[in-house]
Amino acid sequence: MTNDKEKRLKELNRMQYEVTQNNGTEPPFQNEFWDHKEEGIYVDIISGKPLFSSLDKFDAHCGWPSFTKPLEDEEVAEKVDKSHGMVRTEVRSKTADSHLGHVFPDGPGPNGLRYCINSAALKFIPKDDLEKEGYGDLKHLFD
């Protein structure tokens, strides 16, 4: 992963690097996926690991893509974040150790969680491209 990660880091734009590597936050309502409605999955921009599904995406009116849950809990790590004078729960990708965003206890659904994720940390794979992009095992989500 180290060589792959180094290669992928060099391919990131400034915002993607700032968010994923320096725990940055992109501007609300001015990012690629905040209002994105196409069916598919969102993967870690660095590792390519599947993180979230459009089926779990909802409009939280916060300006960032929001999800009720990750695709697989094993790929998302939570960490206490005491920056900016508050205590929050940071969300990171386990494989690439990239900053993704934060999770808050104010979401809809049975778990009541809102995963507020930076678009800059994600790559979207449309459901019709899952097989072609190597995520064919997740096609069943959209049947």
From Swiss-Prot:
<dbReference type="InterPro" id="IPR002579">
    <property type="entry name" value="Met_Sox_Rdtase_MsrB_dom"/>
</dbReference>
<dbReference type="InterPro" id="IPR028427">
    <property type="entry name" value="Met_Sox_Rdtase_MsrB"/>
</dbReference>
<dbReference type="GO" id="GO:0005737">
    <property type="term" value="C:cytoplasm"/>
</dbReference>
<feature type="active site" description="Nucleophile">
    <location>
        <position position="116"/>
    </location>
</feature>
<dbReference type="InterPro" id="IPR011057">
    <property type="entry name" value="Mss4-like_sf"/>
</dbReference>
<feature type="domain" description="MsrB">
    <location>
        <begin position="5"/>
        <end position="127"/>
    </location>
</feature>
<dbReference type="GO" id="GO:0030091">
    <property type="term" value="P:protein repair"/>
</dbReference>
<dbReference type="GO" id="GO:0006979">
    <property type="term" value="P:response to oxidative stress"/>
</dbReference>
<keyword id="KW-0560">Oxidoreductase</keyword>
<protein>
    <recommendedName>
        <fullName>Peptide methionine sulfoxide reductase MsrB</fullName>
        <ecNumber>1.8.4.12</ecNumber>
    </recommendedName>
</protein>
<dbReference type="Pfam" id="PF01641">
    <property type="entry name" value="SelR"/>
</dbReference>
<comment type="similarity">
    <text>Belongs to the MsrB Met sulfoxide reductase family.</text>
</comment>
<dbReference type="GO" id="GO:0033743">
    <property type="term" value="F:peptide-methionine (R)-S-oxide reductase activity"/>
</dbReference>
